[in-house]
A protein has these predicted regions:
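Membrane-spanning alpha-helical segments of multipass transporters and channels
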Residues: 1-4, 9-179
Length: 179
C-alpha cells in the first residue's frame, strides 16, 4: 500500500476560469430577485397616476415601469460583469436574454405577491428568496441538500436561471430547456 501510491487523473467536464465565474450564475439570479423586491418596495403599484379604463391597462401601466427598471438593471449588471469583472459568457446575446427573462419573471412574481398581500407580500417574497437560496442548487449540487429542498427544487425560478447561466458560462450547452 505505501509502496504503490494511488495515481489520480483529474478530468474537468466544465472548466471555468475562476471561482467568481462559477458563482456568477447564482449571484446574478439573487441580484435580480433582490432588485425586484427592492423595486416593489419603493414603487407604488397600487395608486394609478391616471384612472385606467380597465384592469389590463392598469396592469400594463405598472408592469411597464417595473419591466423598464428590470431591463436597466439587467443591462447594467451584464455590462459591468463583462467589462469590469471579465466575465466571458459563450454568447452575450443569450446571456442578455436569460438576464432579461429572469428580471421580468422576478418582477412579475414579486408584483403579484405585493398586489395580493400588500406589504405582507414583500415579507413572503423574502421567505421565498431564502427558500430559493437553499433550494436552487446555486452553491452546491441539490443532491447534497435534504429531501425538502430536493422536493421544491424543480418549482423554484432561480433553479432555471442558474442552470441557464451555467450553460452559458461554463458548460457550453443549450439554454432552451431552462427557458
Amino acid at each position: 500500500m505505501m509502496a504503490e501510491p494511488v495515481i489520480t487523473n483529474q478530468i474537468e467536464t466544465a472548466p471555468v476560469a475562476n471561482n467568481g465565474t462559477a458563482m456568477a450564475p447564482y449571484m446574478m439570479s439573487v441580484a435580480l430577485f433582490v432588485g425586484a423586491i427592492s423595486l416593489n418596495l419603493m414603487y407604488d403599484i397600487f395608486t394609478p397616476r391616471n384612472y385606467p379604463k380597465n384592469g389590463r391597462s392598469w396592469w400594463a401601466s405598472k408592469i411597464s415601469v417595473l419591466s423598464a427598471v428590470g431591463i436597466c438593471q439587467s443591462l447594467i449588471m451584464v455590462t459591468l460583469l463583462v467589462k469590469v469583472n471579465g466575465l466571458a459568457p459563450s454568447s452575450i446575446d443569450k446571456t442578455l436574454l436569460v438576464t432579461l427573462l429572469t428580471a421580468f419573471v422576478s418582477v412579475s412574481i414579486v408584483m403579484l405577491f405585493n398586489l395580493l398581500f400588500d406589504k405582507v407580500g414583500s415579507f413572503l417574497m423574502l421567505i421565498f428568496l431564502i427558500l430559493q437560496l437553499s433550494g436552487s442548487g446555486g452553491t452546491y449540487p441539490i443532491q447534497l441538500s435534504n429531501s425538502f429542498f430536493e422536493a421544491i427544487h424543480p418549482y423554484l425560478p432561480m433553479t432555471y436561471s442558474i442552470d441557464a447561466y451555467r450553460q452559458l458560462f461554463g458548460i457550453g450547452g443549450s439554454i432552451s430547456m431552462d427557458l
